[in-house]
Amino acid sequence: MAHESNETRQNLIKATSELMDLHAIEDISASMILERAGASKSSMYHFFEDFGDLLDETYVVRFGENVRVSIVVIEKIIARSTTKEEFFVALDRLTASTQDRGLASLRFSRARELARSERNEKFQKSLGKLQQQLTDSLTSAFQTAQDKGFLNKDFEARTGAVFIQAYTLGRIVDDITENQMNDADWQKLIGRIAREVLG
């Protein structure tokens, strides 16, 4: 019985997440989620305080999935790099993928999650724990890179961890403009900052 209950809860979150990929958040209704999940209205209110609580939980799950992927990617780069040049070449490839213009929707999603937490203490705490986990993991990874001589020790590893996240999300300011910057030039600038300031 407990397994069935948990499955229903997960189905509601999964259905909500799938709809978030297809529709603007304001266009998603509880009835759309219930139909997609094959669940009843009473089951939704059994697991969640209200519709907003279900949305919050789904945002947290999606955020957590992105956090785990980000941690694995950066840890692999540092573990597999044997020289400083190998490290920065791998970092260049990562920059090219994370800064891809086609990932604008992902940046907008992250911005919505952060904005949603401003006046929602419960959601902010849940999101904050995951964000802390990401920053802590990146900090540890940066410390390893510093110990291996890939990055200099003139800055604290945590500062570097926050910096790399900031410019990744910061691309969003160009996503909404009509006259957009040159992608290659942007990636070149990031690579230069990484090598000349962080390296």
Model-derived regions, located:
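Short loop-to-helix capping motifs
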Residues: 50, 116-121
